Amino acid sequence: MSYSAFVQARDFLQAHRTDYETAYREFKWPELNEFNWALDYFDVMAANNDRLALWVVNEDGSEQKMTYAQMSKRSNQVANWLRGLGVKRGDRILMMLGNEVPL
């Protein structure tokens, strides 16, 4: 499973972040045939996760908050929108977004 292999490697590095020699000597790169950040990491982490993921305080004092689950749902909506425009797996696209919560 890509998620668990990645998390295991990440956790090892975090546990040894102040011990460079051990981290360098014992770290093993996870064997990942394929890895998709959105599907293999973020979606797994976001599944039924109602913890706060993003909290933006605007200049006027208003706030925008989103949970991991909400961000995952919105990401899926954008992916489906792109699919509807004809974007296929493997296509390269560039999206320019402002510094704001809505995609």
Identify what each model region corresponds to.
Residues 2-14, 33-54:
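A short N-terminal helical cap/helix-turn-helix that marks the beginning
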Residues 13-17, 29, 53-56, 79:
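A broad "ordered helical/assembly scaffold" signature
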Residues 17-24:
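Non-catalytic terminal regions with compositionally biased, polar/charged low complexity
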Residues 24-33:
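Active-site diphosphate/adenylate-binding microenvironment
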Residues 50-101:
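Conserved AMP-binding/adenylate-forming core of the ANL superfamily
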